[in-house]
Swiss-Prot record:
Transmembrane segments: none annotated. Its cofactor is Zn(2+). Zn(2+) 2 binds at residues 62-63, 135, 173. It comes from Hyphomonas neptunium (strain ATCC 15444). The keyword Cell cycle does not apply. Its EC number is 3.1.2.6. The keyword Zinc applies. This is Hydroxyacylglutathione hydrolase. Zn(2+) 1 binds at residues 58, 60, 116, 135. Pathway: Secondary metabolite metabolism; methylglyoxal degradation; (R)-lactate from methylglyoxal: step 2/2. It catalyses: an S-(2-hydroxyacyl)glutathione + H2O = a 2-hydroxy carboxylate + glutathione + H(+).
Length: 256
């Protein structure tokens, strides 16, 4: 039987989501990234939890900026990507793809997802069908390719695509409404996308989150995850080349 974890999601900064993940059996709590130390500490107090570890997906300040203040307040350990260890404030343990990290009785696997940054990682809890993906992938979107190449980013998205379809993707930002506007320019006739967009509009009108995103739904609707489809490659002018098709879609989004 899989170990229960509790995921507490809350908004912080302009459009980030914060995540506290708690394993009741051990009483341990991890912070996934640290956009805003004060908000994280307040949310932990509200839940009567104490942050025991921080797990960073990448080095950007809206993901690791609160590390040192939270560490000072709680004495927590900080786990982060080995490839960005020099940029992760207060890092104690360096991890890379294939490593495992523990939260009490729950185990997460580290996945290398470079592209947005060169050392970007994700944390996948297979038994709990949850993946914390940082800025690698969003609902109907993916991160801008700041440090890596389009080929690198596509390989990262392929790793995410291989996760079980029922995996919930806990993305780091509420970008879904703007991503949806772009997605319909790529696949205007996609029926699943039209239904998803209607749901997104309703959720946002009610000021409710659209995250987490179900991988199964993303595979049917997220243009960035669909670059391996022959019809998508043809439409983007790169028949037989998924990486180039992805690059074309990403370039269009950058200019959108």
């Amino acid at each position: 039987m899989s170990v229960l974890i509790e995921i507490h999601q809350f908004p912080c900064l302009n459009d980030n989501y914060g995540y506290l993940v708690h394993e009741p059996g051990s009483g341990r709590t991890i912070a996934i990234d640290t956009p805003d130390a004060a908000v994280y500490l307040a949310e932990a107090e509200k839940m009567s939890w104490t942050i025991s570890e921080i797990w960073n997906t990448h080095w950007h300040p809206d993901h690791a900026g609160g590390n040192l203040k939270i560490k000072e307040a709680t004495g927590c350990k900080i786990i982060g990507p080995a490839g960005e260890a020099d940029k992760i404030p207060g890092i104690d343990r360096r991890v890379k793809g294939g490593d495992t990290v523990e939260l009490g009785g729950a185990t997460a696997t580290v996945i290398d997802v470079p592209g947005h940054t060169l050392g970007h990682i994700a944390f996948h809890f297979p038994d709990q069908e949850a993946a914390f993906v940082g800025d690698a992938v969003f609902a109907l979107g993916c991160g801008r390719v700041f440090e890596g190449t389009m080929e690198m980013m596509w390989e990262s998205l392929k790793r995410i695509k291989k996760l079980p379809k029922k995996t919930q993707l806990y993305c780091a930002h509420e970008y879904t409404a703007s991503n949806a506007k772009f997605a319909v320019t790529i696949e205007p006739e996609n029926k699943a996308l039209k239904e998803y967009v209607a749901w997104i509009e309703k959720r946002r009108a009610e000021d409710k989150p659209t995250v987490p995103a179900l991988l199964e739904r993303e595979l049917e609707t997220n243009p960035f995850l669909r670059a391996d489809l022959p019809e998508m490659q043809l439409a983007m002018g790169h028949a037989g080349n998924a990486a180039a098709t992805f690059g074309e879609i990403r370039g269009r989004k950058d200019r959108f």
